[in-house]
Amino acid sequence: MTARAIMIQGTGSDVGKSLLVAGFCRLAARRGLSVAPFKPQNMSNNAAATADGGEIGRAQALQARACGLDPQTDFNPVLLKPQSDCTAQVIVHGRPTATLEAADYMARRDTLRGAVLESFARLTARFDLVIVEGAGSPAEINLRDRDIANMGFARAAGVPVVLAGDIDRGGVIAALVGTKTVIDPADAAMIRAFLINKFRGDPALFEPAMADIERMTGWAGLGIVPWLSAAARLPAEDGVALEQMRPTGGGRIRIAAPMLSRIANFDDADPLRAEPSVDFFFVPPGQAIPRDVDVILLFGTKSTLGDMAFLRAQGWDHDILAHARTGGRILGICGGYQMLGQWLCDPEGVDGAAGELPGLGLLKTDTTMQGEKTVRPVTGQCARTGLPVSGYEIHAGLTRGPDAARPFLHLPEGPDGAISPDGRVEGTYVHGLFAQDAFRAAWLENVRAGASSDAAYGASVEAALDELADGLEAHLDVDRFFALAAAPGWRGAPS
């Protein structure tokens, strides 16, 4: 089998590429096609674990779900996980290969391009259709000579492109026409069509502009996607969306999460944000954690020691310790769990610069960073309730200490996490727990009696994916979109 393929690129970050791909994947699956998502290169600290112990971007895991598939490393062959302002861990085919500065990474682009094309070839041999997501914008012409995420991939693989513009941020006409103006003519020839995303109001008012864009670019207009409420119910991928999240409001339980500088896998909060009983909000840098919250949730981070120092620089350590002294609840997940302990040690510089830092001291545990990374799906039982749980681990530390004798979970691989003697401070390495309805309801009930609900998170995600697909079908020429897909090797321009 040789699949057809089509690529969605955007005029910038956060224009909605990830959810557009997810919606088109669900549409293709509903039409009976075997379809797979593909993102050549992603930059995100939100990762998902694959069954074989690899990791990919969580956006590709959601797109896989839209296809009816489990996450696979070929869906995102290169994942960059920022560790500092200048360095990132490079994940290739699901496995960490190096931590590099930008210049060193660029020197490896030929090797990485080979890894990308290798994964793409495997997918095109297995599926009817591959829907590809670009990264950022193809108009970043300063990066074009080393690009493997946008036109560098599209031209190497011969995949036609649809360009998405975000009208909500303004300037969408300039963004689309400007992209055509600044990119290489051979790159522009790869673009077959465009669409407008996140429109509010009467789309008829924009129809004349659609004709203008078609005339100025030579690209076909596929339509105008309105602001779809389903998109807000699906997991956000990156920090751009995180900064735009507002408090959910109205719930009986108030949960605050400090916005760490290298926060990772913050989609652990999505099921809580969807709960009617929960008022969940992120606390941005420079603001104190309110005193009246019921729970402080410390998320994972790509740089535990670095974010421990960042947390202290914001004064959040004082807020967290005061919360604990007054009987408040605290839960740490992954790196957040590590921070709750007494010491964080990184003798080999696995997590950043080598060294050690005191933790918050709320759990009698110590963590040592190790080069061997643990990445795996897990199943087990909640130690407090005995309920079955499942999730995944992605971490590089080993945590030991007296409080670990009171584990948070019982897993076949051994006990996980720790609980303080009074039961109010808890930590776990396992992500994805709150996506399970029974566990989430029991945990909320333990925080405050009568606060649990019968919300079904998994079903709500499936419903949102279907609504997203319905919205695309109602407002875009989806038949034309699928007709544009071509067999790999198609050439709209010389490579």
From Swiss-Prot:
Keywords, alphabetical: Cobalamin biosynthesis, Glutamine amidotransferase
GO MF: ABC-type vitamin B12 transporter activity; catalytic activity
InterPro entries: Class_I_gatase-like, CobQ/CobB/MinD/ParA_Nub-bd_dom, CobQ_GATase1, CobQ_N, CobQ_synth, GATase_3, P-loop_NTPase
This protein's record includes keyword Mitochondrion: no
Pfam family, one: CbiA
Residues forming the catalytic site: 334, 431
Every GATase cobBQ-type domain range: 252-439
One example of a Gene Ontology biological process annotation: cobalamin biosynthetic process
Pathway named in the protein's UniProt entry: Cofactor biosynthesis; adenosylcobalamin biosynthesis
Biological role: Catalyzes amidations at positions B, D, E, and G on adenosylcobyrinic A,C-diamide. NH(2) groups are provided by glutamine, and one molecule of ATP is hydrogenolyzed for each amidation.
Family: Belongs to the CobB/CobQ family. CobQ subfamily.
PANTHER family assigned: COBYRIC ACID SYNTHASE, DETHIOBIOTIN SYNTHETASE
Name by which UniProt lists this protein: Cobyric acid synthase
Gene source species: Hyphomonas neptunium (strain ATCC 15444)
